[in-house]
Design a protein with these regions (language model features):
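A short helix-coil junction within the Rossmann-fold of NAD(P)-dependent oxidoreductases
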Residues: 1, 27-36
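Substrate-binding pocket helix/loop in short-chain dehydrogenase/reductase
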Residues: 1-2, 6-11
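Active-site loop-to-helix junction immediately N-terminal to the catalytic Tyr of the SDR YXXXK motif
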Residues: 5, 51-59, 71
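Active-site helix of classical SDR
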Residues: 25, 61
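Residue(s) in the substrate-gating loop at a strand-loop-helix junction
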Residues: 45
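Active-site-adjacent segment of SDR/Rossmann-fold oxidoreductases
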Residues: 50, 71-81
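C-terminal helical subdomain
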Residues: 85-86, 102-151
Length: 155
């Protein structure tokens, strides 16, 4: 709960999920702009758009990163930068086992087989680096979208 949240944990989420994205972009963009091209892909989350109990720090930090991705697209597209985000959804990783054990919100109630395989985000990220993803520049792509899964060749 936000009222009982740990300020240090909140700060860590902002440092990693928001400031980490900022520092990565800030370090790479000058070089990309100088060469006239480059691709930036950020990792978003459905939590950037939907508040979840017990995850205020994660939701807020991911929402900030999603907006930064849009801002980078607005600032860089005309200068040759390709910027977009990927919201992979829930991926079958150790993190999901930890979330399940926490019992905090509806994500913890999901069955293991409801999570997507880790290979799907990896394959999608590679696809996003190609010209085939150009119609999606400036957007956040969600692997929950069956149409995207088909476009990428996952299903």
């Amino acid at each position: 709960m936000l009222a009982e949240s740990d300020p240090e944990a909140w700060g860590d989420a902002i440092d990693i999920n928001l400031k980490g994205v900022y520092h990565g972009m800030r370090a790479a963009m000058p070089h990309m702009l100088k060469q006239g091209h480059g691709t930036i892909i950020t990792i978003s989350s459905g939590a950037a758009h939907n508040a979840l109990e017990g995850w205020s720090h994660y939701c807020a930090s991911k929402a900030g990163a999603a907006m930064m991705t849009k801002a980078a697209h607005v600032e860089g597209a005309a200068k040759g930068l390709r910027v977009m985000g990927l919201s992979p959804g829930t991926v079958a990783t150790q993190m999901q086992r930890e979330i399940k054990a926490s019992g905090v919100n509806p994500v913890s109630e999901m069955n293991w087989e409801d999570h997507i395989p880790a290979e799907w985000p990896a394959r999608t990220l590679l696809w996003m680096c190609s010209a085939a993803a150009d119609p999606f520049l400036g957007q956040e792509l969600a692997l929950r979208d069956e149409g995207l899964r088909k476009t990428v060749g996952l299903i």
